[in-house]
C-alpha cells in the first residue's frame, strides 16, 4: 500500500461492487457538479463524533446506530424520517437510564443508498441485466432503462440527503428531542399488550423525570433536555460519489468525506489491497468496518 494518498488514489486499486457506467462523460460531468456542491456535514461535527466514539471505546458511553438497510427515492417522506429518528430517540432514553451513561446516536440515514450484490447481473426469462445496486446507482424495476446505472441518480441522492439532514437538524435542535416528550412516547408504547415487560422501567424513568421537574430541571432550564446530538452514517460503497464529496477542512488542513459524519466499509469490500480501504484510509471521519 503506497503512503501517498489522495481522494482519487483508490482508482489505482481493484474496486469491487462498482457499477459499470455506459456514458463516462455524463458521469464525469455529474461528479464535477457534485464536487462544487456544499458539504452535507461539517468536519467539526465529524470530529465531535470521533471524540464521542472515543468515550464509547473507553467504556464511558454507549453507541446506538440504527436505520434502514438501504434508503430509497420512492419512500422519501418527512414522516419516515421522523419515525426513524423517533425510534432511535426512544431507544436512547431507555439505554441512558439503564446504562447510566451517555448514548451516542448515529443514524444509518441521509446517504445509505448503495447496495453491494453477490452477482453483478441478474437473469430473468433469458434477459440479463445489471443487478439492482441501490437507488443511487439504478432502479429496481427489471428493464433496461431502470437497470442501467444512471449518473443523474447521484444528484438525486445528494439532494435527498441534504433534505433529510435539514429535517434531522431541525428535529434534534428544535424541541422534538425534548426528553419529556420522548418519555411520553415510551409511556404510550408500553400501554400495548406486548410491551408489559417495559412498563416497570418506564415507570422508574417517569419517577426520575418528576423529581427533576420538581427541582426545576427541565427542557427550559437545561439545554441538554430539549435537544440532542445526532450523527449520520452510510457505507462508503460508491467511491466516485464519496470522492466528489471529499474536501480539505479549512481548520485542520485534513481531508474529510462530507457526505456523512461516519463511513464504513462493508464485509465484501474490505480487502486490504482494495480500492475501498485505500479511500477510507485517507479521510479523518470516524470509520467502521463490517
Label the predicted regions.
Residues 36, 56-85:
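N-terminal ordered "arm"
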Residues 39-45, 54-55, 59-61, 69, ...:
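Dynamic "connector" segments at or just before major functional cores
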Residues 28-35, 70-75, 255-260:
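A generic short-segment signal for beta-strand/edge and adjacent turn/coil regions
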Residues 76-86, 90-290:
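Active-site-facing alpha/beta catalytic cores
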Residues 2-62:
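N-terminal basic/disordered segments at the start of proteins
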Amino acid at each position: 500500500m503506497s503512503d501517498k494518498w489522495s481522494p482519487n488514489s483508490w482508482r489505482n486499486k481493484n474496486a469491487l461492487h462498482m457499477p459499470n457506467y455506459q456514458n463516462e462523460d455524463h458521469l464525469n460531468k455529474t461528479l464535477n457538479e457534485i464536487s462544487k456542491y456544499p458539504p452535507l456535514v461539517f468536519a467539526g461535527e465529524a470530529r465531535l463524533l470521533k471524540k464521542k466514539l472515543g468515550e464509547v471505546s473507553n467504556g464511558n458511553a454507549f453507541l446506538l446506530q440504527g436505520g434502514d438497510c438501504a434508503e430509497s427515492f420512492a419512500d422519501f417522506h418527512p414522516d419516515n424520517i421522523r419515525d426513524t429518528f423517533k425510534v432511535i430517540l426512544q431507544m436512547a432514553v431507555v439505554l441512558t437510564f439503564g446504562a447510566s451513561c451517555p448514548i451516542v446516536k448515529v443514524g444509518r440515514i441521509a446517504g445509505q443508498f448503495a447496495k453491494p450484490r453477490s452477482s453483478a447481473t441478474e437473469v430473468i426469462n433469458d434477459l440479463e441485466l445489471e443487478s439492482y445496486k441501490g437507488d443511487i446507482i439504478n432502479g429496481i424495476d427489471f428493464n433496461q432503462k431502470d437497470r442501467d446505472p444512471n449518473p443523474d441518480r447521484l444528484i438525486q441522492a445528494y439532494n435527498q440527503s441534504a433534505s433529510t439532514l435539514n429535517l434531522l437538524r431541525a428535529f434534534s435542535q428544535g424541541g422534538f428531542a425534548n426528553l419529556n416528550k420522548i418519555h411520553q412516547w415510551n409511556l404510550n408504547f408500553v400501554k400495548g399488550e406486548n410491551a408489559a415487560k417495559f412498563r416497570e422501567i418506564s415507570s422508574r424513568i417517569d419517577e426520575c423525570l418528576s423529581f427533576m421537574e420538581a427541582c426545576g430541571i427541565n427542557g427550559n432550564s437545561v439545554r441538554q433536555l430539549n435537544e440532542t446530538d445526532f450523527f449520520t452514517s452510510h457505507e462508503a460503497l460508491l467511491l466516485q460519489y464519496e470522492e466528489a464529496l471529499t474536501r480539505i477542512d479549512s481548520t485542520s488542513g485534513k481531508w474529510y468525506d462530507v457526505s456523512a459524519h461516519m463511513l464504513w466499509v462493508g464485509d465484501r469490500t474490505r480487502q486490504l489491497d482494495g480500492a475501498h480501504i485505500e479511500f477510507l484510509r485517507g479521510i479523518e471521519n470516524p470509520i467502521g468496518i463490517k
